[in-house]
Amino acid sequence: MEEQSTVEYWGDYKVIAELEQGLWSRDVLTEHRFIKKRYVLKILPSELSLSEDFMKVFQKVIVQLATIRHPSLVAIENVSQEKDRYFIVTEENSGTISLAKYLSGRKLSEEEIVYLIQQLCEVLELVHEIGLAHGQINLHSVHVSFINGVANIYLPEVGFASLLRERMFSSIMQKASMQESVECIRDLLVFEAPEEKSTNHRATDAYSVGVLAYYLLVGAFPWGAFPKPSSCIPDSIYDWDSFILSCLQQQQQARPKRLRDALKKKTLGEQLQSTIDHCRESLRAMEVQEEVSEPIAPTSLIREGEKLFEGKEEQQAFVLVEAKSIDEAMVTTVDSEEVSESGEGYVNPLQSLLAREPVVSRYVEIEREEVKPQPLSTEMVFIEGGDFSRGSRDGQRDELPVHNITLPGFLLDIHPVTNEHFVRFLEFIGGEQDEHYNELIRLKDSRIQRRSGRLIIEPGYAKHPVVGVTWYGASSYASWIGKRLPSEAEWEVAAAGGKLGMRYPTGEDVDKSKANFFSSDTTPVMSYPANILGLYDMAGNIYEWCQDWYSYDFYENSALEPDSPQGPPQGVYRVLRGGCWKSLKEDLRCAHRHRNNPGAINSTYGFRCAKDVK
């Protein structure tokens, strides 16, 4: 750690303020000395940095968490080391508090509980999908952050919580009396599933969610033979009994695989039945009160001729009604002969008024031709065909071997597709899904918003590259505009300047004056110099989807079949190229390969289009 005039630095980050101490890190607010943006550093204590068991899990978790972005998870920007101390660079947040502190003196409504539980279930499912789990979910490990005054779930210990169990108990014992420590640890143990040491972390997380949901609803933990939530909250809208009991099953396989699907609303009939059952139980519990007789007035106060009220209600007589057929019962018209003579003066004129046929002119809709939005054109650069070198010896294993390929000439957009281009496509198709229900873009991860049914681009972002687009969205847009996505080979050749075979699109080196990388956001397209072929933003700004499926060893096959390589015929991932605004310098190399699921959504994913030359 470097000291300069009593100012604490961690690498390029100047410490501004100390934040709340976490279980596994010292959190400090910092500012980057060059880009002047604030970050939160999570600095590992020396004992954890020297622990092989912890560091083994730490490295795995960090790599996996860095692949996803969610407001409820720590947004990892970078990981660094200084003097044998590791620290994580994360985005600045508005501050969080533990759920235990948030609930202190506060009773949540069912709507608030549903909002928090559904958020928790959503982020846990996302974490489970990448092979991680939370573990040790409780009132202290779950935090809340505040966005526009609304409490939202925040999980700062995903992946580490199970390793910190003993550290957490030790911290409790040091800060509280023996009696308080025992009570606190007891309340933490209730969240642990019977098989807490099991490797089926999805099931243990589901158990803890059930305990948490019960506590939020009832205000107590489900110890022993606990009462069902429906008996405590008879007017609840959601079927908490089924949700909580399924989460608390002793057998792991009996717990729900998808937590969000397990929480469902009651039907109206079930809600009514719950209320009726509660009323019946309340009536049974009520003590039978003795009847209070009516006080008898003194005879001296009763005037002659008056009767004393005895308080007895007259019994209502039952009236026998002759049954009629259903057809007779449904007749509701009034027969004029049945109307009394006293009503004849106004009934007949009224009937004649109602019998008149209203004269209504026929409405003819004026046919208007619907004007569909038309695509905006983008200038394209012609890439001359020929023989090119592909791959690199300085990168990852999937970039080998270096080999020659042959490509025909093709056209490529000079810059990535922008928000103003893509919003026209969304207006044309009228939604964010294709005909196969594939998501094309997730608006909350983009700079395009839907307000009152209209698509609006955030101010100042019209010329920025569109982000949050899936491979399906990129491919669909390209087809709509009469183009296609470039192949991985075409993209690499274009980035490397054709036959020049440059290391970076900008030449043999790259710096922040030539590309947007390791920054805080996208920049408008064409903000940096073009490469030697006249293509902009081939390095940094956004990752760009390519047409090909990804294969780790595809370059070996490409070396054997060098004519117009198109990638494997099928696969799990699609190729992404070019690095992005948050990438490190190495990710901007022309040969660097990236990949993700075609339905993956990220605020760093965009695309540009290509076209064959006929």
Swiss-Prot record:
Superkingdom of source: Bacteria
Residues reported to bind ATP: L19, E20, Q21, G22, L23, W24, S25, R26, D27, K42
Cross-referenced SMART domains: S_TKc (SM00220)
This protein's UniProt keywords: ATP-binding, Kinase, Nucleotide-binding, Phosphoprotein, Serine/threonine-protein kinase, Transferase
Catalytic reaction annotation: L-seryl-[protein] + ATP = O-phospho-L-seryl-[protein] + ADP + H(+); L-threonyl-[protein] + ATP = O-phospho-L-threonyl-[protein] + ADP + H(+)
This protein's record includes keyword Kinase: yes
Pfam families: FGE-sulfatase, Pkinase
Post-translational modification: Autophosphorylated on serine and threonine residues.
Record EC number: 2.7.11.1
GO molecular function, one term: formylglycine-generating oxidase activity
Residue ranges occupied by any Protein kinase domain in the UniProt entry: 13-302
Family affiliation: Belongs to the protein kinase superfamily. Ser/Thr protein kinase family.
Function: Together with the serine/threonine kinase PknD, may play a role in the specific interactions with host proteins during intracellular growth.
Name the record gives this protein: Serine/threonine-protein kinase pkn1
